[in-house]
């Protein structure tokens, strides 16, 4: 059974473990700790009591930015990322947020397809933004209009 709840400070070690497993260039523990507080809307998705995914989002006035989302590799391809994003979008709409922004690696075709299926559109590209093992790659900036 899947449950979505707030990502609390006490949940950060489990989220950090997922971050390490899910991303080739993961955030540091310090970055994780600094993305908590009242201006953040952070969620976790647990499956049978174990954290399987998380999302970290900053809300400023009527805009939000999804800073990080990850699904544990053992739980990928089960629709958990979609469920977490749909929950986030619903919560942002309740708060009157007009636009949700995110950036994604140009090579992350699965994530781009998910975002597009939820209504995100490409806004711009940041050239050579992300590090790779052999250089840099572009970030695609995407936006989802939520409410007016």
From Swiss-Prot:
Acetyl-CoA binds at residues 69-71, 108. Coiled coil: none annotated. It is found in: Cytoplasm. Pfam families: Acetyltransf_1 (PF00583). It comes from the Bacteria. Residues 2-147 form the N-acetyltransferase domain. It catalyses: N-terminal L-alanyl-[ribosomal protein bS18] + acetyl-CoA = N-terminal N(alpha)-acetyl-L-alanyl-[ribosomal protein bS18] + CoA + H(+). The keyword Phosphoprotein does not apply. GO terms for molecular function: protein-N-terminal-alanine acetyltransferase activity. SUPFAM superfamilies: Acyl-CoA N-acyltransferases (Nat). The active site is at residues 103, 115. Its main location: cytoplasm. Keywords: Acyltransferase, Cytoplasm, Transferase. GO terms for cellular component: cytoplasm. Its EC number is 2.3.1.266. Belongs to the acetyltransferase family. RimI subfamily. Acetylates the N-terminal alanine of ribosomal protein bS18. NCBIfam families: PRK09491.1, rimI. This is [Ribosomal protein bS18]-alanine N-acetyltransferase. It comes from Escherichia coli O157:H7.
């Amino acid at each position: 059974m899947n449950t979505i709840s707030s990502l609390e400070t006490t949940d950060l070690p489990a989220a950090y473990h997922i971050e390490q497993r899910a991303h080739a260039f993961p955030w540091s523990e310090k970055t994780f700790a600094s993305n908590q507080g009242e201006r953040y809307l952070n969620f976790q998705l647990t499956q049978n009591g174990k954290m399987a995914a998380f999302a970290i989002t900053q809300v400023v006035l009527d805009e939000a930015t999804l800073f990080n989302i990850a699904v544990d590799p053992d739980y990928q391809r089960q629709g958990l990322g979609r469920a977490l994003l749909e929950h986030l979008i619903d919560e942002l709409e309740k708060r009157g947020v007009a636009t949700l922004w995110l950036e994604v690696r140009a090579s992350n075709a699965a994530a781009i397809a998910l975002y597009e299926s939820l209504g995100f559109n490409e806004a711009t590209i940041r050239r050579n933004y992300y590090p790779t093992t052999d250089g840099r790659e572009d970030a695609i900036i995407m936006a989802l209009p939520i409410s007016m």
